[in-house]
A protein has these predicted regions:
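Short acidic, glycine/serine/threonine-rich loops at helix termini
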Residues: 24-27, 57-62, 100-101, 146-149, ...
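Short helix-capping segments at alpha-helix termini
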Residues: 36-42, 81, 106-107, 188-189
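Surface-exposed amphipathic alpha-helices with a cationic face
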Residues: 32-35, 101-108, 185
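His/Asp/Glu-enriched, well-ordered alpha-helical/loop segment
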Residues: 151-169, 173, 185-245
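Generic structural signal for well-ordered alpha-helices
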Residues: 1, 25-32, 75, 101, ...
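Active-site glycine- and acidic-residue-rich loops that bind
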Residues: 20-26, 93-95, 108-120, 170-183, ...
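Divalent metal-binding pocket/active-site signature
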Residues: 49, 56-72, 77-153
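Divalent metal-dependent hydrolysis catalytic cores, especially in the metallo-beta-lactamase
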Residues: 1-27, 42-55, 82-93, 109-112, ...
């Protein structure tokens, strides 16, 4: 938090990855302690949970071992374990995701769309259930797809066609090239766009190996070229950008 504050960040939302229940509970406890100890850094304003309810087809840097469908008894137990959650990213096409969206709304938590292979019709249904925001537009999500010879609009197209849908983009200049950033701005407008760093622990650190997720069971990544990459360099694994970038 102190490192990010040096680069202009005033508030931040610590974010989880898909992980075991034990690690998630440990994260909740760590966050509660950090809120008290953090007096000089960027202010913690709540937690963002990414997963584990994501599509295996769009797992990205998320550990596929932990991916699953939403089960009420499970996510309700998580909600009872922390009052700090302000946003939860989910793949809305999964069985049980629509019901979960309604539950999150009841808890005043923003349901968000991420790591998803949904088609347009599934996104519009999810929007009505409270999924009014898209996490990391273009990253690990469907665009125009073909199923049995027929083409279907995906999440990206739905983001533009649903006027009041807000979108978040990783604005590090690497995840999305400049023309694509301009495209998003042109068609959504500044009031429907949130810029984020998506910074992982490698932010402010020198190039080399790092860990995405927990130190005990997280995924090894490589920091180079101003971004975190999977070890085989086949995909990005988060950003190391700071707000000034």
């Amino acid at each position: 938090a102190e490192t990010h504050a040096k680069y202009g960040t005033t508030s931040m939302v610590p974010t989880t990855l898909t992980c075991s229940d034990t690690e998630l509970m440990n994260m909740f406890a760590t966050y509660r302690k950090a809120k008290v100890l953090n007096t000089k850094g960027a202010k913690f304003i709540g937690l963002h949970l990414e997963g584990p309810y994501f599509s295996p087809k769009q797992s990205g840097a998320q550990d596929p071992i932990y991916l699953k469908k939403p089960q009420p008894e499970e996510y309700n137990a998580i909600l009872e374990s922390s009052e700090d959650i302000i946003r939860w990213s989910v793949a809305p096409e999964l069985e049980g995701a629509i019901k979960m969206g309604h539950v999150l709304q009841e808890h005043h938590i923003l349901p968000s769309i991420a790591h998803t292979d949904a088609i347009y019709e599934e996104v519009t249904q999810a929007y009505k259930a409270g999924y009014t925001h898209i996490t990391h537009l273009y990253s690990a999500m469907s665009s125009v797809t073909r199923r049995n010879a027929f083409r279907y609009a995906g999440v990206v197209e739905a983001a533009y066609l649903i006027d009041d849908m807000t979108v978040e983009i990783i604005a590090d200049g690497i995840h999305l090239p400049k023309p694509l950033l301009q495209f998003v701005y042109k068609f959504k407008g500044a009031d429907k766009i949130a810029l984020c760093t998506d910074a992982m622990r490698g932010a402010g650190m020198p190039d080399g190996e790092s860990i995405l997720g927990s130190l005990a069971n997280g995924q090894k990544v490589i920091i180079e070229d101003g971004v975190a990459k999977m070890p085989d360099r086949s995909a990005f694994a988060g950003s190391v950008a700071t707000t000034n970038r």
